[in-house]
């Protein structure tokens, strides 16, 4: 998992794990490596001691230096050798936008052709700053209420492209690990399904939590998944970050309409995998279940009662009150969607039913919607390999045509 290649180095893969062909011999991008991988690179390729790798890792992730010549406590001879066989290649910022509420969004170009781009969002709040990180260019799961799904899918992001989002944001914010923290939390909730890019995501999260990296505690790094049951089980043995599940419906019939993955991994299997995750990771005492509220779709009182029952069953299975936490998310509209946001009255009524059932339920405050940076609005720039963009455009055109005819 911590392997590296100096020449050539092709780390970009499709979902099936096949490399994308490249005729260009590349230097090793050090952002691609976690601590163990960097130590091996310094020992095996450069013939250097491990502490040299630690020096360079701190320059990269603590001081945000990408030029070896600026690493002043690294010997000149080593800097010259690093220039010859390695690089620190970070994503290029296409543009960045500021929201009136302080939210900040970056569009970052990915890959050497720069044809694809992803979005990364920073959300400041009292005493904390959360970075929402993408794991794929587009998404292959086709959830019907998500803007990213309409863009189709291109490929998985490399480890360097994932941790590079953190690097760009932290550098912009003037974040100083262990001292002046502007970036306190990372959520893998951006574009893509993180567990479909398992190895690269886990390696990137390792750097986020490493003291030589960004020094975040395990509980401050959250992975959100639509429910790939086998990969949740694998995650429980390889990482102990906080787990969030995109539930969005309290029963299989409705969830299959919203999250097609449910046809393969129904709710009973999904909940069982969450139970196993907490059983293996004793330091984690809860799973957050995300529930996007859409007007007339999943926001009725019967849905709330059904969800409360499902959450109580999870608490009972774990023998811990509060093992299930619910994050209610008002739907954030995007062009062409057929869904609407639930009314404030219905949102509060839904929450009250959960609270009365002694289920911890919070309503997520909408942030960054004026710059399309709110939950479910990220779309980036995707060279689609799935034809989904064209299908979505045809759907919109058909809908407009029917409206005109009426």
From Swiss-Prot:
InterPro entries: Aldolase_TIM, Methyltransferase_A, RlmN_N, RNA_MTrfase_RlmN, rRNA_lsu_MTrfase_RlmN/Cfr, rSAM. Keywords: 4Fe-4S, Cytoplasm, Disulfide bond, Iron, Iron-sulfur, Metal-binding, Methyltransferase, rRNA processing, S-adenosyl-L-methionine, Transferase, tRNA processing. One of its GO terms (molecular function) is tRNA (adenine(37)-C2)-methyltransferase activity. [4Fe-4S] cluster binds at residues 139, 143, 146. Residues 125-370 form the Radical SAM core domain. It is an enzyme of class 2 (transferase). S-adenosyl-L-methionine binds at residues 192-193, 224, 246-248, 332. CDD domains: Radical_SAM. Its EC number is 2.1.1.192. Binds 1 [4Fe-4S] cluster. The cluster is coordinated with 3 cysteines and an exchangeable S-adenosyl-L-methionine. It catalyses: adenosine(2503) in 23S rRNA + 2 reduced [2Fe-2S]-[ferredoxin] + 2 S-adenosyl-L-methionine = 2-methyladenosine(2503) in 23S rRNA + 5'-deoxyadenosine + L-methionine + 2 oxidized [2Fe-2S]-[ferredoxin] + S-adenosyl-L-homocysteine; adenosine(37) in tRNA + 2 reduced [2Fe-2S]-[ferredoxin] + 2 S-adenosyl-L-methionine = 2-methyladenosine(37) in tRNA + 5'-deoxyadenosine + L-methionine + 2 oxidized [2Fe-2S]-[ferredoxin] + S-adenosyl-L-homocysteine. It is found in: Cytoplasm. It comes from the Bacteria. Belongs to the radical SAM superfamily. RlmN family. HAMAP family: RNA_methyltr_RlmN (MF_01849). NCBIfam families: rRNA_mod_RlmN. This is Dual-specificity RNA methyltransferase RlmN. It comes from Xylella fastidiosa (strain Temecula1 / ATCC 700964). The gene is rlmN.
């Amino acid at each position: 998992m911590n392997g590296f290649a100096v020449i050539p180095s092709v780390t970009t893969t499709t979902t099936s794990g096949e490399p994308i062909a490249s005729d260009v011999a590349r230097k090793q991008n050090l952002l691609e490596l976690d601590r163990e991988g960097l130590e091996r690179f310094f020992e095996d390729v450069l013939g250097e001691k491990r502490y040299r790798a630690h020096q360079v890792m701190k320059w990269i992730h603590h001081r945000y230096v990408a030029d070896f010549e600026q690493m002043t406590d690294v010997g000149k001879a080593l800097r010259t050798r690093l220039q010859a066989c390695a690089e620190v290649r970070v994503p290029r910022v296409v543009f960045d936008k500021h929201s009136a509420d302080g939210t900040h969004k970056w569009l970052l170009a990915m890959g050497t052709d720069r044809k694809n781009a992803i979005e990364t969002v920073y959300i400041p709040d009292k005493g904390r700053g959360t970075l929402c990180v993408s794991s794929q260019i587009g998404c292959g799961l086709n959830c019907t209420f998500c803007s990213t799904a309409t863009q189709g899918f291109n490929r998985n992001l490399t480890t360097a492209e994932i941790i590079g989002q953190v690097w760009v944001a932290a550098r912009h914010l003037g974040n100083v690990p262990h001292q002046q923290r502007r970036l306190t939390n990372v959520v893998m909730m951006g574009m893509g399904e993180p567990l479909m890019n398992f190895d690269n995501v886990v390696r990137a999260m390792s750097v986020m939590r490493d003291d030589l990296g960004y020094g975040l505690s395990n509980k401050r790094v959250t992975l959100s998944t639509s429910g790939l049951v086998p990969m949740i089980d694998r995650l429980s043995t390889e990482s102990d970050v906080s787990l969030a599940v995109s539930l969005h419906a309290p029963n299989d019939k409705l969830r299959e309409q919203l999250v097609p993955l449910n046809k393969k991994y129904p709710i009973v299997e999904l909940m069982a995998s969450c139970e196993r995750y907490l059983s293996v990771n004793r330091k984690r005492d809860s799973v957050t279940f995300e529930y996007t509220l859409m007007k007339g779709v999943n926001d009725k009182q019967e849905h709330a009662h059904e969800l409360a029952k499902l959450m109580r069953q999870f608490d009972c299975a774990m023998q811990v009150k509060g093992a299930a936490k619910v994050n209610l998310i008002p739907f954030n509209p995007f062009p062409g969607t057929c869904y609407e946001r639930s009314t404030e009255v219905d949102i509060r009524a839904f929450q009250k039913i959960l609270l009365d059932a002694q289920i911890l339920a919070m309503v997520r405050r909408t942030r960054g919607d004026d710059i399309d940076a709110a939950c479910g609005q990220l779309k980036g720039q995707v060279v689609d390999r799935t034809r989904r963009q064209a299908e979505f455009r045809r759907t919109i055109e058909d809908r407009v045509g029917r409206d005109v005819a009426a």
